[in-house]
């Protein structure tokens, strides 16, 4: 697939998602980094978003809860260019009834070349990156070229 450059602004759109057993670690992480996070637009799935607002006092744009379609809503926002970074604390020890949704979310993040953190250590690396508060150019699929080629 052909690629094109997409410019990210210094204020990023960051999605925060966590499975049930990982909501507290995500809230703890977000509270620790609330100053840096406050410079960005934050999104979350439903329950996680409410817990994050309570823990940090930050404003969060909330989708529905993950098992009710929130993971898919976040994925749609990624494919529409509305999410720049995904912080997704998932529990590797718990079977997930909505596992296909989780796999789809991670696949979409990979397709659209967005940074993904799956635990506090990887999230620390992203939030402390020099690019978090700077403009950044990334390669994304060129959908217009894709359609033109398909309709050719």
Swiss-Prot record:
Positions annotated to bind substrate: 19, 23, 45-48, 65-66, 98
PROSITE patterns linked: METHYLGLYOXAL_SYNTH, MGS
Positions of the catalytic residues: 71
Enzyme Commission (EC) number: 4.2.3.3
MF GO annotations: methylglyoxal synthase activity
Disulfide bonds: none
GO biological process: methylglyoxal biosynthetic process
Cellular component GO terms, alphabetical: cytosol
Coiled-coil positions: none
Domain annotation MGS-like: ranges: 6-152
EC top class, as a word: lyase
Record key words, sorted: Lyase
Domain of life: Bacteria
Classification via PANTHER family: METHYLGLYOXAL SYNTHASE
Family named by the database record: Belongs to the methylglyoxal synthase family.
Name of this chain's protein: Methylglyoxal synthase
Organism: Teredinibacter turnerae (strain ATCC 39867 / T7901)
Gene this protein is translated from: mgsA
């Amino acid at each position: 697939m052909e690629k094109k450059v997409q410019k990210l602004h210094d204020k990023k759109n960051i999605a925060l998602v966590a499975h049930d057993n990982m909501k507290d670690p995500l809230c703890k992480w977000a509270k620790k980094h609330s100053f840096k996070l406050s410079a960005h637009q934050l999104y979350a799935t439903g329950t996680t978003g409410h817990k994050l607002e309570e823990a940090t006092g930050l404003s969060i744009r909330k989708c529905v809860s993950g098992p009710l379609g929130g993971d898919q809503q976040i994925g749609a926002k990624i494919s529409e260019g509305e999410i720049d970074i995904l912080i997704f604390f998932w529990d590797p020890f718990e079977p997930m009834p909505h596992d296909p949704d989780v796999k789809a979310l991670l696949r979409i993040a990979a397709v659209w070349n967005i940074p993904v953190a799956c635990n506090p250590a990887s999230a620390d690396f992203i939030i402390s990156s020099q690019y978090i508060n700077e403009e950044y150019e990334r390669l994304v699929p060129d959908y217009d070229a894709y359609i033109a080629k398909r309709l050719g």
